[in-house]
């Protein structure tokens, strides 16, 4: 039989084949370590590896060079990325909860809305990283070097112990390189001994944060909320902070 009726079997087969085709943009089986390494081995500067939407959770990828890979919407839950080279990677909308980035290099990464809750970034280099709307709640960035915009990020209860968020005097030819923490939620965060020199803390919420021995010299505190902070008497440079008179303290 010819005509539309004769075409039906072929149409059905085509529809079934299309429905069975894997959608790489959706959740799929986790990748194995050797699959990740093979993809990175094939990568070139012109064609970085593309792991968009893929699941790399739980893998041991410590020390691996990701060669500017695209990790958009990638799952990296509890992945070991200690000392990994993640410079210039894309982590936008990635989920990296409880991942280990200890001493990793994340310089110049693009990480809009990245989920880093409970992640470990101790001593990591996070220079010129875009962290708009990122979630760093309960993350550990102790000793990390952090420079770049993180407007509207969440960092409740995060650890920034002795972290360096201050202005970078060596790169001022590129414009002022510092942390832009406008409207960031630092409530309950531990900023003990942190370098916050010239950090933009405009409208940031530091309620209950520990600022013992933190350096706020030149930081912009316009509209910042500093209620119930700990260690106020030991804060360095508070008298030289910008707009400190317009910050909200208990008194």
Model-predicted regions and their roles:
Residues 9-19:
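Bacterial N-terminal signal peptides
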Residues 1-11:
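Bacterial N-terminal signal peptides that target proteins for export
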Residues 24-251:
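Tandem repeat scaffolds
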């Amino acid at each position: 039989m010819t005509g539309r009726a004769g075409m039906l079997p072929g149409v059905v087969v085509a529809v079934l084949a299309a429905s069975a085709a894997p959608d790489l943009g959706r959740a799929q089986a986790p990748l194995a370590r050797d699959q990740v390494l093979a993809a990175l081995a094939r990568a070139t500067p012109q064609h970085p590896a593309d792991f968009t939407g893929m699941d790399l959770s739980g893998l041991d990828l410590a020390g691996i060079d990701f060669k500017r890979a695209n990790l958009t919407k990638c799952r990296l839950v509890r992945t070991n990325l200690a000392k990994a080279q993640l410079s210039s990677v894309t982590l936008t909308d990635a989920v990296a909860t409880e991942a280990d980035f200890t001493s990793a290099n994340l310089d110049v990464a693009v990480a809009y809305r990245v989920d880093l809750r409970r992640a470990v970034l101790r001593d990591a280099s996070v220079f010129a990283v875009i962290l708009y709307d990122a979630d760093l709640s309960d993350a550990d960035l102790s000793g990390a070097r952090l420079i770049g915009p993180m407007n509207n990020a969440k960092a409740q209860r995060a650890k920034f112990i002795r972290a360096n968020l201050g202005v970078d005097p060596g790169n001022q030819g590129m414009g002022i390189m510092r942390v832009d923490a406008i409207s960031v939620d630092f409530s309950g965060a531990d900023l003990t001994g942190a370098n916050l020199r010239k950090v933009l803390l405009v409208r940031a919420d530091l309620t209950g944060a520990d600022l013992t021995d933190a350096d706020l010299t030149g930081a912009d505190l316009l509209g910042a909320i500093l209620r119930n902070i700990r260690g106020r008497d030991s804060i360095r440079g508070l008298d030289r902070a910008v707009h400190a008179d317009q910050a909200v303290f208990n008194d």
